[in-house]
UniProtKB/Swiss-Prot annotation:
Heme binds at C440. A cytochrome P450 monooxygenase involved in the metabolism of retinoids and eicosanoids. In epidermis, may contribute to the oxidative metabolism of all-trans-retinoic acid. For this activity, uses molecular oxygen inserting one oxygen atom into a substrate, and reducing the second into a water molecule, with two electrons provided by NADPH via cytochrome P450 reductase (NADPH--hemoprotein reductase). Additionally, displays peroxidase and isomerase activities toward various oxygenated eicosanoids such as prostaglandin H2 (PGH2) and hydroperoxyeicosatetraenoates (HPETEs). Pathway: Lipid metabolism; fatty acid metabolism. One of its GO terms (cellular component) is cytoplasm. GO terms for biological process: cytochrome metabolic process; epoxygenase P450 pathway; icosanoid metabolic process; prostaglandin metabolic process; retinoic acid metabolic process; xenobiotic metabolic process. The gene is CYP2S1. It is found in: Endoplasmic reticulum membrane; Microsome membrane. CDD domains: CYP2 (cd11026). The lineage of its organism: Eukaryota, Metazoa, Chordata, Craniata, Vertebrata. This is Cytochrome P450 2S1. It catalyses: all-trans-retinoate + reduced [NADPH--hemoprotein reductase] + O2 = all-trans-5,6-epoxyretinoate + oxidized [NADPH--hemoprotein reductase] + H2O + H(+); all-trans-retinoate + reduced [NADPH--hemoprotein reductase] + O2 = all-trans-4-hydroxyretinoate + oxidized [NADPH--hemoprotein reductase] + H2O + H(+); (5S)-hydroperoxy-(6E,8Z,11Z,14Z)-eicosatetraenoate = 5-oxo-(6E,8Z,11Z,14Z)-eicosatetraenoate + H2O; (12S)-hydroperoxy-(5Z,8Z,10E,14Z)-eicosatetraenoate = 12-oxo-(5Z,8Z,10E,14Z)-eicosatetraenoate + H2O. Induction: Up-regulated in skin upon exposure to ultraviolet radiation or treatment with all-trans retinoic acid (substrate-inducible). It comes from Homo sapiens. Belongs to the cytochrome P450 family.
Amino acid sequence: MEATGTWALLLALALLLLLTLALSGTRARGHLPPGPTPLPLLGNLLQLRPGALYSGLMRLSKKYGPVFTIYLGPWRPVVVLVGQEAVREALGGQAEEFSGRGTVAMLEGTFDGHGVFFSNGERWRQLRKFTMLALRDLGMGKREGEELIQAEARCLVETFQGTEGRPFDPSLLLAQATSNVVCSLLFGLRFSYEDKEFQAVVRAAGGTLLGVSSQGGQTYEMFSWFLRPLPGPHKQLLHHVSTLAAFTVRQVQQHQGNLDASGPARDLVDAFLLKMAQEEQNPGTEFTNKNMLMTVIYLLFAGTMTVSTTVGYTLLLLMKYPHVQKWVREELNRELGAGQAPSLGDRTRLPYTDAVLHEAQRLLALVPMGIPRTLMRTTRFRGYTLPQGTEVFPLLGSILHDPNIFKHPEEFNPDRFLDADGRFRKHEAFLPFSLGKRVCLGEGLAKAELFLFFTTILQAFSLESPCPPDTLSLKPTVSGLFNIPPAFQLQVRPTDLHSTTQTR
C-alpha cells in the first residue's frame, strides 16, 4: 500500500513537471524580452532570492539591460523596466496599454479585481473618476482639506508634548494622525489616539504593509499557487486585512442606518451609498457593495501607512543630520515665526524645507518596484511583442537611485532640489508616485499631509535621538513591494523659534 502511494506521488510530480515544461514552452518567450532561463517549478528562484527581490532585479538588469523578463514561479512571466527612459516610455508614452493593475498575490484573494485600486478596464475608469470627484467635493485639494490636516497636526503636536522629553517610538502616533485624515474623508469621523479599536486598525494597516513586503510575502508572490492552502505568513496578513474589513463594514452599516437620501454626502461612504441608490435599477452597474468596500479598505490602508512611513523616515533623517534640522528650523523661523501655523501657501517661501521632503522621499523610495502593472492589450514595445495580460514591474527605485541622475544616490543631500540661488527646483526623475494613468490616486493629499505634518512638528520641536546620531541606521529593515525603514526612538523638546537665525 505504501509503495502504491509512493508511485502515485512520483507520477503526480512527473506529470506536474511535464505540465510546467509544456506551459513554459507555450509562453512565447521569443516575443518577450530576454532574461534568465526559468527552471521547472522554480521559475527564477535561483536568481531572485525572496527578501531581496528588488536588489536581485537590479543585479539582473546589469546583464540583460533595462527591459527583461523574469519568472516568479513556473507560470508567471513578468517584464521588468529599469531606469527613467524605459519606465517613461512605457507608463507615459504608451500609457493606455500599460494602464492595467498587476497582481499582488498576498492581496489577490481579498480584492479579487474589485475596488478602485485592483480593478481594470471600465470598472476601474468609473470607480477612479467617481472616487476622485467625491474626494474633491469633500475638500481634498481645497481649503477644507488643508484645515483638516492642520487640525490633526495640532493634535499630534499636543500628544508629542505629553511625552515631556522622554524617548518614544513615534510610528503608531504618526500612523494614527494620517489615518484620522483619511477616516475623516471616508467616514466623517476622527478617533482619539487612545481608542483601542482605532489602534488595532492602524496596527492592522501596518501589518498589511509589512506582510506584502516581507520575505514571506515575496516568497508567496512566487509560489502562491502552492502556498495558498498551507499555514504561513500569508494567513497573518489575511487576519490584518480582516481587521480592516470588519472595521470598514461596521462604519458602512452605521452610515446605512442614518443616510439622508436627499442631503449632500458627508463623506466617501455616503457618496458611494447615494450613487448605489441611483444605480439600483442598472444591472451592469459597477457601484456595488463589494466595489465600495474594496475601495474604502484600500484607501484606509494606503492612506494610513504611506504618508506616516515617509514622515517618520524624514524625522529619522533629521535626527541623523542635525545640521539639516537646524537649517529647516531656521527657515521656518525666518519665514513664519512662532505664531503663524504652516499652510500649503507657504511652500514657495520654504524652498529648503521642500527640498528636504523631496530628498527624503527620493532616498526612501517607498515603493521601489512600483505597483505592478499589466498590459491591457497586446503591445509592441522596443521591438518585443508583449501579450495582453503580461505583468510589468516598473522599478521606480531604479530611477530615484540612479547614479547617472542623482550623484552619490545613497547620500542624503537636499541641495539636489535647489538651484544656485537657493530656490526649489523640480526634477523630472522625481517619480515616487509613479506616472501615467495609474499615478497614485492620493498624490495631492499625500503631498499636503507630508508638508503640513512635517513643518508643524519642526516648528514646535527640536528632534533628538537617545543614541548618537552617527549610530542611526537609515537602511530599510524590509525591502519588498515597500521599503520599510527601521524603528527608532525620538525625543522632542519645545523649540524657541525666536532664536537668532543664520544664513546657510
